[in-house]
Amino acid sequence: MAAGRILVVAPNDELRRSLAFALEAEGYEVTARRELPYHGWVAEKAFDGTVLDQRALTGTEYESIAFCVKAHPVVLLAIRPHSWLVEWVSDIVEMPVIGNAVTSALDRAIVPAG
């Protein structure tokens, strides 16, 4: 069973709740947000990983990249990922999400300490 503190950012209520439920069932401790939180808050919380719906990125490219750097490792959920964002995320899961694609991507992205 997985373990770790995960931030989920998705503007769609159903998707956000579904992701939180699935990740909690896998053993993750989940904090879910509708919008991107401030970078300082993300750094302070020191999450083990982030699941990010690309539709939550409403700012500039620079702001989106800065968030991905602070929230690393990031698993991006997208129908068509922004080409400028691809190198700043750990993994990409195509939408619609099928099966355990998100948990598998998180398992690959999160490197155990030690």
Give the location of each predicted region.
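Phosphate-coordination loops involved in phosphoryl transfer and adenosine-cofactor binding
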Residues: A2-R5
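Conserved acidic carboxylate
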Residues: A10
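Two-component/phosphorelay signaling modules centered on CheY-like receiver
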Residues: D13-T31
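Conserved phosphotransfer microenvironments
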Residues: R16, L36-W41, D48-A71, I79-H82
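A structural preference for short, hydrophobic beta-strand core positions in alpha/beta folds
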Residues: A32-R34, L76
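CheY-like receiver
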Residues: W41-V42, A105
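Local beta-strand N-terminus motif with an aromatic residue
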Residues: F47-D48, V89
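Output/docking surface of receiver
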Residues: H72, L77-G114
